[in-house]
Amino acid sequence: MSDPLSVNTVLVPVDGSDESARAVDYGVTIAAEYDASIHVVYVVGEEVVRGIEAGRVSKEAVADEAGAFADRALSLAEEASVPANNSTAFGFSPTRKTRHPGSVILDTADEIDADFIVVPREGGAENTGDVLEKAAEYVLLYASQPVLSV
């Protein structure tokens, strides 16, 4: 018989989409059930990274957006008495071909020693460029932790 699942840290990658907000809800619920903490990582996508590098997108505006989303996620965790923290990661690099949202999520999971990952999978039809819907399959295939795709 296998040991019961033990969860200390739940990782929830987000991109600011409605789907990632729903993933935070699930992540907080799982963390509360297992008396675990939650870590929300805001993954910045390729289009935004290229815009920052070209000077078309303000790095400060991206930081503000990521911070506002993280604040909402952390407030939700606080309401559920779940310890929470957050970070931001670029999910793309023009100089490293192996850097993409899926690898960033798994690298973050390793760095924070996450036991469980909740990843948004379905993007809205109007948001075909959502960063995380492209990464979900990669995470599902290669994560060493249990993954809930929502």
Q: What positions do the PLM features span?
A:
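Small/aliphatic-rich secondary-structure junction motif
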Residues: 5-54
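Short, well-ordered secondary-structure micro-motifs
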Residues: 23, 50-53, 96-99, 129-130
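Short, structured coil segments at secondary-structure junctions
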Residues: 34, 80, 135, 142-144
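Short, hinge-like loop/turn segments at secondary-structure boundaries
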Residues: 56-59, 103, 136
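A short acidic, glycine-rich active-site loop
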Residues: 57-71
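Structural beta-alpha unit
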Residues: 78-117, 125-127, 145
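Glycine-rich, Arg-bearing micro-motifs that act as flexible, cationic patches
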Residues: 116-138
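Short hydrophobic/aromatic patches at helix-to-coil boundaries
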Residues: 146-150
